[in-house]
């Protein structure tokens, strides 16, 4: 009967947890009824470069990195920067720190409704992750409370964080790091939420100074994510990730595997090419030599020059 009806019903929503529950909750009336689901994704790194090139032909690699770090390719944020002609990394920071800037309250506006009355706990956890406390034990030590259930919901119900384990580890590995999925939210919790008292006091120029001061460190992580996206978009690799041992040492920024052709890329990623130490990278690679046995391994140094 359904096949005979010429009827198309679309349902869309911006609250991820609600849409997930309505269509994928086992006890919900619409469970299993959807014939197709479309998840809106950010622009690719190639598209971001095209947008920046069309609107700022003289852009630098620093501008491109900032464009990616602040937007993650999300159309709403891309549009705000383009419409305001803020397409250099300094102009982007200045725009975000202006009085009445929509960026200042964006994180709170989109997440409070998601989290409900427990939003302060979730915000504290996300702030910890954005500021480098990426292991559960480190977050719990800082917050002085157990957070296992909250991490599970942030990952599975809200799709805001993702769990990272070292390449070649078993899925049940306890050597876990957490990171915020969305680039802008990572930035928002790192700066706007952390320094919310500056915003409330109207000290936006001071906030801008802090962002400019800490931007090189913050953008280093964004550069790693940029290259992971680039490699993923190529579709040439069957597994992508990083590596670190149980002590958090021998860290490798990017490992890309083609498990069919038995090819591997092992890469060190730095903002400045002169800071890449290929000898040190190859020594780290020795710690995973067993796992790469049978692979043709290429060691690479990737920097902003390669964007």
Protein language model features and the residues they cover:
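Short, small-residue-biased leader/transition segments that mark boundaries at the very start
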Residues: 3-8
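A short beta-strand-to-loop transition that corresponds to the Sensor-1 phosphate-sensing loop
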Residues: 11-17, 21, 74, 303-306
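A contiguous, low-structure linker/loop signature
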Residues: 1-2, 17, 88
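Short regulatory helix/loop adjacent to the ATP-binding pocket of P-loop NTPases
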Residues: 17-34
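Switch/connector loops and helix/strand junctions flanking conserved nucleotide-binding motifs
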Residues: 17-22, 47-48, 275-276, 307
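A cross-kingdom feature that marks ATP-driven nucleic-acid transaction machinery
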Residues: 174-307
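Conserved beta-strand scaffold positions in the cores of enzyme catalytic domains, especially
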Residues: 35-39, 299-301
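Interdomain hinge/linker elements that couple catalytic modules in large macromolecular machines
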Residues: 37-185, 189-190
């Amino acid at each position: 009967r359904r096949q005979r009806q010429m009827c198309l019903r679309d349902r869309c929503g911006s609250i991820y947890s609600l849409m997930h529950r309505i269509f994928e909750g086992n006890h919900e009336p619409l469970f299993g009824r959807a014939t197709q689901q479309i998840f809106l994704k950010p622009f690719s790194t190639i598209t971001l470069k095209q947008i920046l090139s069309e609107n700022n032909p003289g852009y630098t690699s620093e501008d491109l990195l900032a464009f990616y770090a602040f937007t993650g390719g999300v159309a709403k944020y891309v549009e705000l920067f383009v419409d305001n002609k803020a397409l250099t990394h300094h102009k982007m920071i200045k725009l975000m720190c202006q009085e009445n800037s929509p960026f200042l309250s964006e994180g709170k506006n989109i997440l409070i409704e998601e989290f409900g009355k427990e939003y302060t706990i979730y915000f504290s956890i996300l702030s910890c992750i954005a500021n480098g406390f990426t292991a559960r034990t480190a977050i719990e030590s800082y917050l002085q409370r157990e957070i296992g259930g909250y991490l599970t919901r942030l990952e599975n119900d809200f799709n805001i964080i993702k769990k990272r384990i070292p390449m070649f580890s078993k899925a049940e590995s306890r050597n876990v790091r957490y990171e915020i999925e969305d680039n802008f939210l990572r930035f928002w919790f790192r700066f706007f939420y952390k320094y919310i008292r500056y915003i409330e006091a109207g000290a936006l120029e001071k906030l801008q100074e802090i962002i400019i001061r800490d931007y090189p460190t913050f953008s280093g992580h964004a550069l790693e994510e940029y290259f992971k996206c680039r490699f993923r978009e190529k579709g040439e690799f069957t597994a992508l990730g990083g590596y670190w041992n149980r002590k958090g040492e021998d860290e490798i920024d990017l490992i890309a595997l083609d498990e069919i052709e038995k090819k591997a890329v092992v890469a060190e990623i730095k903002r400045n090419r002169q800071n890449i130490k290929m000898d040190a990278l190859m020594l780290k690679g020795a710690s995973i030599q067993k796992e790469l046995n049978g692979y043709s391994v290429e060691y690479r140094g990737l920097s902003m020059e390669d964007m």
